[in-house]
Amino acid sequence: MKRVVGIGGIFFKCKDPEKINEWYKTHLGMDTGPYGATFEWKEDDDSTKKGTTQWSPFSETTKYFEPSTREFMINYRVEDLEALIVELKKEGVTILDEMATYEYGKFVHILDIEGNKIELWEPADH
């Protein structure tokens, strides 16, 4: 079973997400909006399928990264989240919540061995 197949997003804390978005737009040409920027790309094995990677600044006061005390969180794309959760539980990995399903995919949060919160995402188109 494949586990992680790519990076789904980079999330980080900052003092002023609006100013950060504007800076990256002005100086690096990123097409930023209220939630950061979305980078589109095509799947290697099927060029008709598009994938995305999200770049998102969060307020430095966000609770979304808890219980981690880090200033960042990485979202990893996976192929079969339900099966992966079963395996991670068997391996003793800390699973922070129940799998949530939205129109754009399934999500669950885990902790790595250093306490970094990780978001696992199975896109809806998989």
Give the label of every model feature segment.
Residues 1-15, 34-36, 62-126:
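Vicinal oxygen chelate
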Residues 47, 64-66, 100:
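Generic marker of residues within folded, mature protein domains
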